[in-house]
């Protein structure tokens, strides 16, 4: 039985809020057990996760999604299914690219040992789990000064970032930091080999080498993409993306809006500062007010290589120009919140909700004041515990990549 249900016909995401039909997630595996105090900054974590609790929290998140009838696709299951359906050449290419990209760089001796170890796995699932988790000298039964011969991919539970669903296509990303760049190996593999994904247009390829991550990519409606200029995504990349989209006749977007946000390492994407939760309701962190700046790319009249134009609008007017009516802006922790509450709930990704339908969102229970403010504004909040998951610096939107949504009427 496929990871996709019978309704899934391919990538179809033309909004942030349309009823969620199919979504990609990844429950953190053994890879998070290899995070050590000395490597927190390098591995992009704020603290070491208690892994049993983190997995329980993730299961709660997934259960809430499944309760709504959403087809929840686990990344490992998708990679396994793709691998089992792929040609011998595609399987060999995946393994060789994994070895090429491994961190630390493998010596000839270690490369041979890792390759033999992976090829000896009794199941595809075991092979994939080791590729994600990392491989130790104990696994290989070799002597080495290094304990980890291949580093883990501990951020992979943030499935939002390696690629983004954009209309009927995808952008597959070149990620800012080495620890995450390897994650797109799996994105390239599934979109090149899975029968239900292989014909998906690519609007961005990581080979283009300019940094962009999925937490910065938003589809506000059929006409408008919104992309963050952040700690992880550059304006230069968005300019290249605009050119690629303009050149692709399958893509119907008419406008890209780039939004400048604070360049903080712990709040690294647009979705940690501003999110769309309903047809006219947006959640934002007031901390970003003095940093917000907006550029327009005209994909209709901007020529073959549209350029960014500073539109000079305030946030409310910018959003009105996209949705066609006055937006409701909800600040983190609610109107009149103290600076302390704003900073605390911004820190724990208080804007980073996943909309499962217009005006229905899921996110961490710990951001109590923001949850209350959303409910007061007519948003239904589905809370789940995330005290451990949040230490990886992401909330429900970060931990999900919609693959299909119903269109918003």
From Swiss-Prot:
GO terms for biological process: arginine catabolic process to ornithine; arginine deiminase pathway. Its EC number is 3.5.3.6. GO terms for cellular component: cytoplasm. It catalyses: L-arginine + H2O = L-citrulline + NH4(+). One of its GO terms (molecular function) is arginine deiminase activity. Pathway: Amino-acid degradation; L-arginine degradation via ADI pathway; carbamoyl phosphate from L-arginine: step 1/2. Keywords: Arginine metabolism, Cytoplasm, Hydrolase. It is an enzyme of class 3 (hydrolase). Transmembrane segments: none annotated. Belongs to the arginine deiminase family. This is Arginine deiminase. It comes from Metamycoplasma arthritidis (strain 158L3-1).
């Amino acid at each position: 039985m496929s990871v996709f249900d019978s309704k899934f016909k391919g990538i179809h995401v033309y909004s942030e809020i349309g009823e969620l039909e199919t979504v990609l997630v990844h429950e953190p595996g053994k890879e998070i057990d290899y995070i050590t105090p000395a490597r927190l900054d390098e591995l992009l974590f704020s603290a070491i996760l208690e892994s049993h609790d983190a997995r329980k929290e993730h299961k709660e998140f997934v259960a809430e999604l499944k309760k709504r009838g959403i087809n929840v696709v686990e990344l490992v299951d998708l990679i396994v299914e793709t691998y089992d359906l792929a040609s011998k050449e595609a399987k060999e290419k995946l393994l060789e690219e994994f070895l090429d990209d491994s961190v630390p760089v493998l010596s000839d001796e270690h490369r041979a040992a890792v390759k033999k170890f992976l090829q000896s796995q009794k199941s595809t699932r075991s092979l994939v789990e080791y590729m994600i988790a990392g491989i130790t000298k104990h696994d290989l039964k070799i002597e080495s000064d290094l304990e980890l011969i291949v580093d883990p991919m501990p951020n992979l539970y943030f499935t939002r970032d390696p690629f983004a669903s954009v209309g009927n296509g995808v952008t597959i990303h070149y990620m800012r930091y080495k620890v995450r760049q390897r994650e797109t190996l799996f994105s390239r593999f599934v979109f090149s080999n899975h029968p239900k994904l292989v014909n998906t247009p690519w609007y961005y390829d990581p080979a283009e080498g300019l940094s962009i991550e999925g937490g910065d990519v938003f589809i506000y409606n059929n006409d408008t993409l919104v992309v963050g200029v952040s700690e992880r995504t550059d304006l230069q990349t968005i300019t290249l993306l605009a050119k690629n989209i303009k050149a692709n006749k399958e893509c119907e977007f008419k406008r890209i809006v780039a939004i400048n946000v604070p360049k903080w390492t712990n709040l690294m994407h647009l979705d940690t500062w501003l999110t769309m939760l309903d047809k006219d309701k947006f959640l934002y962190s007031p901390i970003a007010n003095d940093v917000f700046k907006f550029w327009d790319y005209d994909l209709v009249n901007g020529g073959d290589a549209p350029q960014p134009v500073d539109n000079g609008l305030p946030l409310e007017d910018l959003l009105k120009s996209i949705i066609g009516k006055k937006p409701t802006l909800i600040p983190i922790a609610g109107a009149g919140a103290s600076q302390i509450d704003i900073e605390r709930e911004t820190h724990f990704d208080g804007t980073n909700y996943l909309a499962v339908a217009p005006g229905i969102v899921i996110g961490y229970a710990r951001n109590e004041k923001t949850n209350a403010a959303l409910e007061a504004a007519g948003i239904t909040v589905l809370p789940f515990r995330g005290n451990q998951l949040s230490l990886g610096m992401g909330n429900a939107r970060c931990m999900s990549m919609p693959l299909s949504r119903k269109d918003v009427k």
